Amino acid sequence: LAGDGCPGDGDCSPIDSLTLDPDDPSQMIMVAVTVTTAQDLYHVMLEDAIPSGTEILDTTLLTSQTATEDDDPRRPFENGWGWWIFNPVQIFDDHLLWTAEFLPAGTYILTYQLLPTHRGAFQVLPARAWQYFYPEVQGSSAGDVFTIE
């Protein structure tokens, strides 16, 4: 978990607590999940559970006035490389799920935003990745405790 604007700013310092500002109801938490694989993998699934006290911000819903930029076909890598490898993220109430039919060897950073809603100390479950047809190939991150004050 990181503060506002993590991936684009180059400073992705992890945070383990957040103080809610009553004057700023739009505070966001940027979550970055890093996946590294030494070899090509098939049928990969990556699941990341969100901590209680937060909600996933679904940017695919057109419910706000945020402006989105169209992709420029003359500059396909302007927003990074490899965005087409993963299928669209599946958003559930308590977790997100990314899938990929083929994942070339390398390092990938998957990001999403959380909206803190309740104060308290909450357990962050480990993110986990596995090959769907080869469950013996799997990995997970570390769990943590996240505090919203």
Q: Over which residues does each language-model region extend?
A:
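C-terminal segments of large proteins
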Residues: 1-149
